[in-house]
Amino acid sequence: MALRLILGFDYGTKQIGVAVGQVITGQARELCTLKAQNGIPDWNQVEALIKEWKPDAVVVGLPLNMDGTPSDMCLRAEKFARRLNGRYNIPFYTHDERLTTFEAKGERRDRGGQKGSYRDNPVDAIAAALLLQGWLDENTALFES
């Protein structure tokens, strides 16, 4: 199956950033931020996104430690990816998301966004777009099948 449209998720315990990427353009953009309670999203909201966008695959960011080893959150992010696959029968991929939140804060600042607290002005969707863009850039061979 050729991949055309992909949703990217920046998994977190309080918020989950969502981005959409198109293989034909090789571009990702932020979509929205979902609330989560202890890492559990409102699955109805997730399902609505899946039905609306009809992705061919999903990419979930892995918050690796700076030395490349898995962080405690990696297990939870991988579990979230498996749940997406189990609920919606969509192939999933994972991608190193180190420093995407830091980079997203800088991008928001460069766009003239508020410099307020992270809680008041989250950057999760920007981080999701950055990790999905990284995945798109590194996996062009998958798009040719």
From Swiss-Prot:
Q: Which Gene3D superfamilies match?
A: YqgF/RNase H-like domain (3.30.420.140)
**Nuclease among keywords:** yes
Instruction: Identify the GO cellular component terms for this protein.
Output: cytosol
Q: Which GO terms describe its molecular function?
A: nuclease activity
TM ranges: none
Database matches in Pfam families: RuvX
Record's subcellular location: Cytoplasm
Assigned EC number? 3.1.-.-
Q: Which GO terms describe its biological process?
A: rRNA 5'-end processing
Supply the alphabetized keyword list. Cytoplasm, Hydrolase, Nuclease, Ribosome biogenesis
Leader peptide range in chain numbering: none
- Predominantly, its location class is cytoplasm
Per the record, the similarity remark reads: Belongs to the YqgF nuclease family.
Q: Which NCBIfam families has this protein been placed in? A: RNAse_H_YqgF
Listed HAMAP family: Nuclease_YqgF
Q: What PANTHER family does the record tag this protein with?
A: POLYNUCLEOTIDYL TRANSFERASE, RIBONUCLEASE H-LIKE SUPERFAMILY PROTEIN
Q: What does this protein do?
A: Could be a nuclease involved in processing of the 5'-end of pre-16S rRNA.
Q: What is this protein called?
A: Putative pre-16S rRNA nuclease
Q: Which organism is it from?
A: Pseudomonas fluorescens (strain SBW25)
Taxonomy of the source species: Bacteria, Pseudomonadati, Pseudomonadota, Gammaproteobacteria, Pseudomonadales
